């Protein structure tokens, strides 16, 4: 799940967590990893994530967040740098197009066995269901 905002507030983080839970039809994500930004150490964030396993990167150590840092570089390089972004609405549409119409659905990823994230996740679900059927 994702949320685009021009402010760094805990409400945006909580909105994204709720979107992820709804999309996956689960009550709690297994692990939430973040940096130590103020929105991730707030009392509200701690309350909402009390039943989740939270992981934090070391302060001023971006290598702990290499995956998301790489993603931010990728979305800029592959998509956003092609445009002169006019306003928030334009930025939102561009991010939506990249994530929902390309990155998650069509773009292959080496760490997903050269499948899109959506295809990889669907395969994972089918394997899990098959294993449950075979075990039971």
Model-based region annotation:
Residues 1-20, 30-33:
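A short, conserved beta-strand element enriched in hydrophobic/aromatic residues
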Residues 1-2, 54-57, 81-82:
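Short small-residue beta-strand/loop micro-motif enriched in glycine and branched aliphatics
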Residues 17, 44-46:
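Distinct, well-ordered alpha-helical segments
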Residues 25-28:
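Short helix-loop-beta connector
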Residues 34-36, 42-43, 56-76, 89-97, ...:
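RNase H-like two-metal-ion nuclease catalytic core shared by retroviral integrases
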Residues 46-53:
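Two-metal-ion acidic nuclease core segments, chiefly of the RNase H-like superfamily
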Residues 50, 74-136:
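C-terminal domain-tail junction helix/linker
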């Amino acid at each position: 799940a994702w949320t685009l905002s021009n402010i760094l507030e805990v409400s945006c983080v909580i909105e994204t967590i709720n979107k992820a839970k709804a999309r996956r039809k689960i009550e709690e994500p297994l692990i939430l990893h973040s940096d130590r930004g103020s929105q991730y150490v707030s009392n509200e964030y701690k309350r909402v994530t009390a039943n989740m396993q939270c992981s934090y990167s070391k302060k001023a150590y971006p290598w702990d967040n290499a995956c998301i840092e790489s993603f931010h570089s990728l979305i800029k390089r592959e998509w956003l740098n092609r445009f002169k972004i006019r306003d928030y609405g334009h930025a939102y549409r561009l991010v939506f197009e990249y994530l929902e119409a390309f990155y998650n659905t069509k773009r292959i990823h080496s760490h997903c066995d050269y499948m899109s994230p959506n295809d990889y996740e669907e395969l994972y679900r089918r394997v899990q269901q098959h294993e449950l059927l075979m075990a039971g």
